[in-house]
Design a protein with these regions (language model features):
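Rossmann-like adenosine-cofactor binding region
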Residues: 2-78
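Adenosine-phosphate binding glycine-rich loop
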Residues: 45-140
Length: 140
């Protein structure tokens, strides 16, 4: 609680076996960026009620499988295509506004796209080259 309550950025990446609220709604301050990323829901049912914007990486991914921090919210109809602000790609492409003021409370639900993995892998490879670290492997 001392790490999360009133924080500017709240990130969770647990691997719980069953849903359990780790993020409590009353801990979220106005203007926070919240990224619950674990396999099970770690937020309370009313958590999405205080969000000014809910952003996802890819809406169709949010509908697949039994896992994800907002699974219960999607299955219950609380989070829908109409209630989310949009997808992160639309924000990055300038087609949709991102944060518009310091008081906006934003939740980003990152389900995990392979393009994210590829981009992160590329960034890691470039950094390793720049620092001249790592071992090159021959894949032929």
């Amino acid at each position: 609680q001392s790490c999360l309550e009133g924080a500017d950025v709240m990130i969770e990446a647990s691997r719980l076996e069953a849903p359990e609220p780790l993020f409590h709604t009353e801990w979220v301050r106005s203007g926070a960026l919240v990224i619950p990323y674990g396999t099970q829901s770690t937020v309370e049912d009313d958590f999405t009620d205080i969000m000014d914007k809910i952003v996802v990486d890819h809406w169709e991914q949010c509908l697949i499988g039994p896992f994800g921090c907002l699974r219960r919210h999607v299955d219950g109809g609380k989070v829908t295509r109409d209630t989310i602000h949009g997808e992160i790609g639309s924000i990055c492409a300038g087609e949709l506004a991102g944060r518009e003021n310091d008081d906006e409370t934003i939740l980003f639900w990152h389900r995990g796209l392979s393009t994210s993995d590829i981009a992160l892998g590329w960034a890691m490879l470039e950094k390793a080259k720049r620092l001249e670290i790592g071992t090159a492997l021959d894949y032929t």
